[in-house]
């Protein structure tokens, strides 16, 4: 049982997280650093831990993550998605709880591209009547 590992890939915005769950005491490593050292915001740390807390597995697995691309918010969302998928592989009975909270759904929202003639995606240049 000690060598059993569960893998999950999570994506959010332009971030991709490859997550590995190993039986352990609840340590979370992100790109070789502790979760608290990687993310400076308590909200992001809470987001990452949500699937583990929801299923009651926060002290049952060690989580090893490699994440790349995007910013901190996208990376946190990708890690949460990856952890949820890995937990599902570990125990299929967790599916209803994870699905209800929306942790298994890939958030498809992406940054809208800038259009020519505009200053940003939708922001138009200032209009002058005269």
Swiss-Prot record:
GO terms for molecular function: RNA binding; structural constituent of ribosome. GO terms for biological process: translation. GO terms for cellular component: cytosolic small ribosomal subunit. Pfam families: Ribosomal_S9. The gene is rpsI. Coiled coil: none annotated. Belongs to the universal ribosomal protein uS9 family. InterPro entries: Ribosomal_Su5_D2-typ_SF, Ribosomal_uS9, Ribosomal_uS9_bac/plastid, Ribosomal_uS9_CS, Ribsml_uS5_D2-typ_fold_subgr. The lineage of its organism: Bacteria, Bacillati, Bacillota, Clostridia, Peptostreptococcales. Keywords: Ribonucleoprotein, Ribosomal protein. Gene3D superfamilies: 3.30.230.10. This is Small ribosomal subunit protein uS9.
């Amino acid at each position: 049982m000690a060598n059993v590992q569960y893998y999950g890939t999570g994506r959010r915005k332009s971030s991709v997280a490859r997550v590995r769950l190993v039986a352990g005491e609840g340590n979370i490593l992100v790109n070789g650093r502790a979760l608290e050292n990687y993310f400076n915001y308590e909200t992001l740390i809470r987001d990452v831990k949500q699937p583990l807390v929801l299923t009651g597995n926060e002290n049952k697995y060690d989580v090893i993550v490699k994440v790349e691309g995007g910013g901190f918010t996208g990376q946190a969302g990708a890690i949460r998605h990856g952890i949820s998928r890995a937990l599902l592989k570990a125990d299929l009975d967790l599916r209803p709880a994870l699905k209800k909270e929306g942790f298994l759904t890939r958030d498809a929202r992406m940054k809208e591209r800038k259009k020519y003639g505009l200053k940003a995606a939708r922001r138009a240049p200032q209009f002058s009547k005269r």
